[in-house]
Amino acid sequence: MFSIVYTTTGNKEEARRIASRLVEQKLAACVNMHPIDSIYEWEGRIEQDTEIALSIKTTSSKVETVTGCIKEMHSYDLPAIISWEIKGEKQYLEWIAGSTRP
């Protein structure tokens, strides 16, 4: 099984630091980074921020470890970390499996 883990960061440097560690440690095959505008409620106030969204491609068995790594490195008090299982083109999924194998 394969998954995408999604999170956001406050800036590109933090996004690159998290993405690099995940790929270097073979926890993710690929991390896409996207600039986004976010509107959300935090501590009773409506906030608007520019953030970087990360789409992290990994195996489902590594989601918990990926989540722990993100939480360890993240600057937010409560980072958004969500995941969902995916289907895809067979060869691409095989590449994800191979790229995350120690």
Region locations from a protein language model:
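Positively charged, small/polar-rich N-terminal and surface patches that mediate targeting and assembly
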Residues: M1-P102
